[in-house]
C-alpha cells in the first residue's frame, strides 16, 4: 500500500502498462493498489502507458482549436440546445453548476466561462433509442464542409471517440480489479450501447472575474455526473481539485501523454461513497486560451444507480434507484436550466 504524506489527498501518476500486459502479475497488483488508494482518497488519479497515440492526442487539440476559431454564427448553427441528443456546440456561458441544487435563482447564477462541442455514439433517427426519445441519444452534427473540412475535424473526433471507448473498457477493468466483486462486476454497465459523451472545451483567456464574493470561473465547483471521466489537458494549467478534509484547492499540472481519471457520482454511489467523487473546478489563471478534451463515461441507460454490495438483495432498493438515464438527465438539465 502506498505510504501517504497527506492521506486525504493522494493523486498519483500510475503507469498502467503492467496491468495491460498481465493483470494478474505482481507488478499489476501495485498498479491496482495505487488506483484503489487514490479512489478512496481523492477519486482522482493520472495514467500513462494507456496506448492512446500521441499523434491522435495532438490532432484532437488541433481540431478543437480549428472549430472554436470559426465565426460565432457558424458555431451557432450547431447549438446543442436545438439538436437531437444534445450534440454540437455548447454556447459560452450557458452552463452553471450553481443551478443544480437550486442554490441560486437562474438570474443570479454565475455561468461557466467556457464553450464546448459534444459528440457521442452516432445513432440514426430510426434507432430505437432515438425514436423513443431516450436522453442524449441521436445523430452527431458537424460543421459544413466548406466551413471546416471533415478530415480536419469530424474524422479526427470520430477516431478519438473510438479510442476513448477502448480506454474506458480498460479503466473499467482496472476499477473492477480494485473492488471485491470480481472481474465481471461492470458487465451490465457496459451493455446496450453504453452512454458516453466526448466534449471539447475552450476556456478563453482573460475573462474570469470576481463577482462580489464569488469567482466566475471557466468551470465552477462541481462533481461529475457519470461513472468516471477521462480528461486530457493541454499545456496550460487550470484544473483544481478540493481536499475534502481540509478544503484546500490543489492544482493538477498538465503532463504530456497523461490522462486524468476521476471517479464520478455514479461510481461513488456504487461504492457507497468509499470511492470519492471530489469537487473540482477550472480556473484559467494564465493569459492563454486553454483547451481540454473530456470523455464522460456513464454506461447502460437502464442500469440502476445503487450500491454494488446490495445488488439483487433488496427489492425496494432496486425499485427506488434511478436509472443512469434518469440520474444524468436530472443533473445535466438542471445545470443548463433546460
From Swiss-Prot:
| Record Pfam families | 2OG-FeII_Oxy, DIOX_N
Aminoacyl-tRNA synthetase keyword on record:
no
Per the record, the pathway is:
Secondary metabolite biosynthesis
Protein residues bound to 2-oxoglutarate: 290
Q: Which SUPFAM superfamilies match?
A: Clavaminate synthase-like
Q: Which UniProt keywords apply?
A: Dioxygenase, Iron, Metal-binding, Oxidoreductase
**What cofactor does its activity depend on?**
Fe(2+)
The chain positions of domain Fe2OG dioxygenase read 193-299
Q: What cystine linkages occur within this chain?
A: none
Report what the protein is called.
Clavatol oxidase claD
Entry cofactor note text? Answer: Binds 1 Fe(2+) ion per subunit.
Quickly give the catalysed reaction.
clavatol + 2-oxoglutarate + O2 = hydroxyclavatol + succinate + CO2
Protein species of origin = Penicillium crustosum (Blue mold fungus)
Q: Which positions bind Fe cation?
A: 222, 224, 280
Q: What does this protein do?
A: 2-oxoglutarate-dependent dioxygenase; part of the cla gene cluster that produces clavatol and ortho-quinone methide. The clavatol biosynthesis cluster cla and the terrestric acid cluster tra are both involved in the production of peniphenones and penilactones. The non-reducing PKS claF is responsible for the formation of clavatol from successive condensations of 3 malonyl-CoA units, presumably with a simple acetyl-CoA starter unit, and 2 methylation steps.
Instruction: List the GO molecular function terms.
Output: dioxygenase activity; metal ion binding
Q: Which gene encodes it?
A: claD
Q: What happens when the gene is disrupted?
A: Completely abolishes the production of hydroxyclavatol, as well as of the clavatol-derived compounds peniphenone D, penilactone D, penilactone A, penilactone B and hydroxyclavatol. Leads to the accumulation of clavatol.
